């Protein structure tokens, strides 16, 4: 058996090195599977939000524990955020969705001075973080009954072998080189970085190609991108707030061209003649999936913010990596705010305003960019970005029947002849007096669903289905069966709504032909070395007691070669907490095979 284990060490020390997987961010060559553990809880008596204001998650990266601190980005949306899309027959529909309890966060890694994070917590953790100078991406793995996530370095996402992508801006901001010379000599101190607070109310338009490409995922994809743009501009004391999203579901409102300069001009004309009359905003960015000519992936007018036609930018969605698209948008927005491309004289060869997109993309502004921005504020004094967004920022007075939800209206479904929304009185643009709700898992035809109607099905046999109460449109808080209840025909015990068993963990690590290794494989966990152990205390590996060996390193095999002892060297290759290790026993937090009645 020892000989088999030695062979395994040679073959499987790094089972993910060289392995690949197709994720939402693309084809990833090397990744780790992690199980983020939430280590914060809502205090007793506190109001339970769907998404808490602050959270912490613990997981391991490269075998070392990290704690990810997250804070909700409460400045992501304007107070009057609205969306416009189009019905199948082409009618324009504008709504004002509630976005206060959203799921987009900024954060940092604990004890990492230069760390940042931009994370969506809507369905698992998705986004990016900086750790020890490297950019990591994280996203959930689509495994049954699992909280597994993939963590991988940006460099491990496969990129197409092609010419470097770049911005299409060629115009120069200033008539002389003086601002460039001053900026290149600038040593930016903390005091100098305290730019005056400015507010950019951002409108985003997604064309039909974008909708076809992303479908229902388009909105969260845009929100995640703007969350990253918001974080990037914090260093400049510029608040980027999303005020409006327009999705061209049915057809485009302009005919986008592969020539980026033509598309930018067309979009500017449409913004001036249509969009500004619909919603007040400071800058508009067009997201498109068209392939621009040459290496161009974005374009914008320089020093143009507040200009009715020129305060625009266009961004090509050329990659599935959300962070890259966010950096491109931040770059084009930088042009709107007076920044030129970084030259050789700048103190950063790979910052945001570099003409060529870098790998990984930078989230820093150079000293040149700071100088350009400061000079732009002084020379142009743009008025539209001076003040925070007002509570209601609609330009035209409300008109009942125009299918736009405006000040003083509870609903607007069009004329009485065309109204298809039964909750709304089309004559008054008020909800009918009998209306109990408009939306929600427990709302149906404007009334609360009857008590007992299932609103959230059980994910697993350890989960509990939630039922409507006849008192609210919202589904009750998710709950699950008690920890320790037998599950999967007594092959496991419930733990936090899941049924962790070794077989499924092997499946997640090594594929559908994998199963649990023979008992003799686990005896290696009594060694107490860097490969086989139960705990790590003060940099020392603690061997497993004989009764605890099935709570240390997980051993798997293949159904066609049961004598093989296969294992995963990373932290994800340890037996998961709550896993059954013997009859009536589970692995506790100390990796001891403990009685199921006391383990939790």
From Swiss-Prot:
Ranges for domain Disintegrin: 397-483
Disulfide bond annotation, renumbered to this chain: 306-384, 346-368, 348-351, 400-429, 411-424, 413-419, 423-446, 437-443, 442-468, 455-475, 462-494, 487-499, 506-556, 521-565, 534-544, 551-587, 581-593
Modified sites of kind Pyrrolidone carboxylic acid: 192
Class of the enzyme per the UniProt entry, highest EC level: hydrolase
Tissue distribution: Expressed by the venom gland.
EC number: 3.4.24.-
Binding site for Zn(2+): 331, 335, 341
A cellular-component GO term for this protein: extracellular region
Family matches, as PANTHER family: ADAM A DISINTEGRIN AND METALLOPROTEASE DOMAIN, DISINTEGRIN AND METALLOPROTEINASE DOMAIN-CONTAINING PROTEIN 28
Name of protein: Zinc metalloproteinase-disintegrin-like stejnihagin-B
């Amino acid at each position: 058996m020892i000989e088999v284990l030695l062979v395994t060490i040679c073959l499987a020390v790094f089972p993910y090195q060289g392995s690949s997987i197709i994720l939402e961010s693309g084809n990833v060559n090397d990744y780790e599977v992690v199980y983020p553990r939430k280590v914060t809880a809502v205090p007793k008596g506190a109001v339970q939000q769907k998404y808490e204001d602050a959270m912490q998650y613990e997981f391991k990266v490269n075998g070392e524990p990290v704690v990810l601190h997250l804070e909700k980005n409460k400045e992501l949306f304007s107070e009057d955020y609205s969306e416009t899309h189009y019905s199948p027959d082409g009618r324009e529909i504008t709504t004002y969705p509630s976005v206060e309890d959203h799921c987009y966060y900024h954060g940092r890694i604990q004890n990492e001075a230069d760390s940042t994070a931009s994370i969506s917590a809507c369905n698992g953790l998705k986004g990016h973080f900086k750790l020890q100078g490297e950019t990591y991406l994280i996203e959930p793995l689509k495994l049954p009954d699992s909280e597994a996530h993939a963590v991988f370095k940006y460099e491990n996402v496969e990129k197409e072998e092609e010419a470097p992508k770049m911005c299409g801006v060629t115009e120069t901001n200033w008539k002389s080189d003086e601002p460039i010379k001053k900026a290149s000599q600038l040593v930016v101190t903390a005091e100098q970085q305290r730019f005056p607070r400015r507010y950019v109310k951002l409108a985003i338009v997604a064309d039909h190609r974008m909708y076809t490409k992303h479908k229902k995922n388009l909105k969260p994809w845009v929100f995640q991108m703007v969350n990253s743009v918001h974080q990037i501009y914090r260093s400049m004391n510029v608040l980027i707030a999303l005020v409006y999203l327009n999705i061209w579901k049915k057809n485009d409102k302009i005919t986008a061209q592969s020539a980026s300069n033509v598309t930018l001009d067309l979009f500017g004309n449409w913004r001036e003649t249509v969009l500004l009359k619909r919603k007040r905003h400071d800058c508009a960015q067009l997201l498109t999936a068209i392939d621009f000519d040459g290496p161009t992936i974005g374009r914008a007018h320089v020093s143009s913010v507040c200009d009715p036609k020129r305060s625009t930018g266009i961004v090509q969605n050329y990659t599935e990596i959300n962070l890259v698209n966010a950096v491109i948008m931040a770059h084009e927005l930088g042009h709107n705010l007076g920044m030129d491309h970084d030259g050789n004289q700048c103190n950063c060869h790979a910052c945001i305003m570099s003409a060529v997109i870098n790998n990984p993309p930078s989230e820093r502004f150079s000293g040149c960019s700071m100088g350009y921005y400061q000079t732009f504020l002084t020379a142009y004094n743009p008025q539209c970005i001076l003040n925070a967004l007002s509570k209601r920022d609609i330009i035209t007075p409300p008109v009942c029947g125009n299918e736009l939800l405006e000040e003083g209206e509870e609903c607007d479904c069009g004329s009485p002849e065309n109204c298809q929304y039964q909750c709304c009185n089309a004559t008054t643009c008020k909800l009918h007096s009998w209306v109990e709700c408009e939306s929600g898992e427990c709302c149906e035809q404007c009334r609360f669903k009857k008590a007992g109607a299932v609103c959230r099905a059980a994910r697993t046999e350890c989960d509990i289905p939630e039922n409507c109460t006849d008192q609210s449109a919202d589904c009750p808080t998710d709950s699950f069966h008690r920890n320790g209840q037998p599950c999967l025909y007594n092959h496991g015990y419930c733990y936090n709504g899941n049924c962790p068993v070794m077989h499924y963990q092997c499946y997640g690590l090594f594929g559908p032909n994998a199963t649990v290794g023979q008992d003799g494989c686990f005896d290696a966990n009594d060694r107490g070395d860097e490969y086989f152990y139960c705990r790590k205390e003060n940099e020392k590996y603690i061997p497993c007691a004989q009764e605890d060996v099935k709570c240390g390193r997980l051993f798997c095999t293949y159904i066609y070669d049961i004598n093989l002892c296969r294992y995963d060297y990373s932290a994800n290759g340890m037996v998961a907490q709550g896993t059954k290790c013997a009859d009536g026993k589970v692995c506790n937090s100390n990796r001891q095979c403990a009685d199921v009645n006391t383990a939790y």
